Amino acid sequence: MAGRGSLVSWRAFHGCDSAEELPRVSPRFLRAWHPPPVSARMPTRRWAPGTQCITKCEHTRPKPGELAFRKGDVVTILEACENKSWYRVKHHTSGQEGLLAAGALREREALSADPKLSLMPWFHGKISGQEAVQQLQPPEDGLFLVRESARHPGDYVLCVSFGRDVIHYRVLHRDGHLTIDEAVFFCNLMDMVEHYSKDKGAICTKLVRPKRKHGTKSAEEELARAGWLLNLQHLTLGAQIGEGEFGAVLQGEYLGQKVAVKNIKCDVTAQAFLDETAVMTKMQHENLVRLLGVILHQGLYIVMEHVSKGNLVNFLRTRGRALVNTAQLLQFSLHVAEGMEYLESKKLVHRDLAARNILVSEDLVAKVSDFGLAKAERKGLDSSRLPVKWTAPEALKHGKFTSKSDVWSFGVLLWEVFSYGRAPYPKMSLKEVSEAVEKGYRMEPPEGCPGPVHVLMSSCWEAEPARRPPFRKLAEKLARELRSAGAPASVSGQDADGSTSPRSQEP
C-alpha cells in the first residue's frame, strides 16, 4: 500500500500517467531517506480564482471529472478543491472544465517590458566583417549572426561559421523583399533566418545556433518560458477582418477556438509591438479583449480572442435606435468605462480610445481593444496623423498623453454611442475641429441623448485635464443612470448577419 500511496502522490504533484514514468531510485537512497511531513510536500502557493496557469505535462486519459490536457496548455483557476492539491479549472481553448492536480501546473507569468528583449538577438547592427569573424569564434558549423553592411548601406550581411571559415552573404533588397540568391525572397530578416534554419538552400550550411548580441535576451525563449508562445502548427488562418497601418487582422482558429490574429511583418515594427504585447500579458479584465499568445513566424502574430459582433461603430450603425434601446447604450458605455477604469488603475494610457476600437461579443459585452498596441502605433506617427477628433487638446498640442486625455476621448466615444455610430464633429474638417476646440467649442448632445449622459460628456471635455473625472467616477455615474433607466438593456430583432440577437441583457 505504501508503494501505491507514493504513486498517487507522484501523480498528484508531477502529473505522470503511469508507473513507467516514475524516476528510478536506488535502494540505498530509499533506506537513508526520511520523507518530509505531508504539509511540507503540499504546494505552498495558493492560486486565486481567475489565475492563469500553464500545464507542465500531458494528461490524455482523465478519470471522470478530471480535465484532459497537453503540455503547455493554458487553463484558468476556477476554485480550489477541499483537497488542497487539486483545482477546478477551465481550459482556454476547449472551454471544458474539470479537476487538475496542482503539481501539474505553473502560473502563467506576465512578460516584462524589457528593452533587452529582442525578436532578433542574432542581429548585431553596425559591425565590420572582421568584428563578425571575431564574434563567431571558436568555429562551429551553423553558428551565425546578421549585421548591417558597411560597404552597401541599407543592405545586410548574413555571417555563417563553416569549417574554419566565416562566410559572408550579402542580403539584397528587391521590390520590398530580401534575398541572397535572387531565387528565394523573404519579407524580413526573421523570415530569412527561419527559412535557412530549416533548409540550407544557397548557403553553406543550415543555420544552427545564433550568436546572440551582448546584452540581449531572446524574445522567443522568454515568451516560451512565461507561457505566451503559441504553436504555429495549431493555427489556421481565415479571411481578413480588418487592416491597420502595420498589418492585416485575420480571423482564424487555434486548436478549434475562434481567434483574431494581427500579423506584423515589418521586423522593426514587430519589435515595437513586442514591447506593447508585454503590457497585454499583464492585463486581465472582462471588458478588455484577451491576449491568447504570440507566434513568431515571418514576423509577429498576435493572437487574441475573437469578438464575434465586430466593432461598436458598425454594430450601432447597422441596427440603429429602432433595435437598440437607451439602456443597452448605457450598458455598452458602462462596460467601456469599467475596462478603462482597470487600465487607469494599472497606470496604462490607451491613446486611441474610440468606438471603432471597442468590440462587441456574442453576449453583448463591450471590450476595449488595442489597449496594449496604441503606444507602438504612435511611434513613427507625427501629430498630423493622430485621430484629431478623439484626441485631447493637450495631447494634440504638446504630445502629452495621460489617463485624463483618455477621459476626453471617452467623452467623444459617448457621443458616438448615443448618436448610434455617427462620426463626431459632423461636417467639420480636422483643422476646423482643432481650432474650434482650442477656442472652447464643444459638440451639442446627439438627438435623444439623456441629460445626465450629456453632463458626463461635458465633464470629460473640461479644458483643464485635472478637472476631468477619473474613470472610476464615470463608471459609478453610468451604473447609477443605468439603474434609473428601469428597462433592461436590449437589442431587438435580427443582426445584420441574419442571426437573432439576445433580446435582453440584464444590467
Swiss-Prot record:
Residues 122-211 form the SH2 domain. The keyword Phosphoprotein applies. Coiled coil: none annotated. GO terms for cellular component: cytosol; plasma membrane. Residues 48-110 form the SH3 domain. It is found in: Cytoplasm; Membrane. One of its GO terms (molecular function) is ATP binding. Keywords: ATP-binding, Cytoplasm, Kinase, Membrane, Nucleotide-binding, Phosphoprotein, SH2 domain, SH3 domain, Transferase, Tyrosine-protein kinase. This is Megakaryocyte-associated tyrosine-protein kinase. It comes from Homo sapiens (Human). The lineage of its organism: Eukaryota, Metazoa, Chordata, Craniata, Vertebrata.
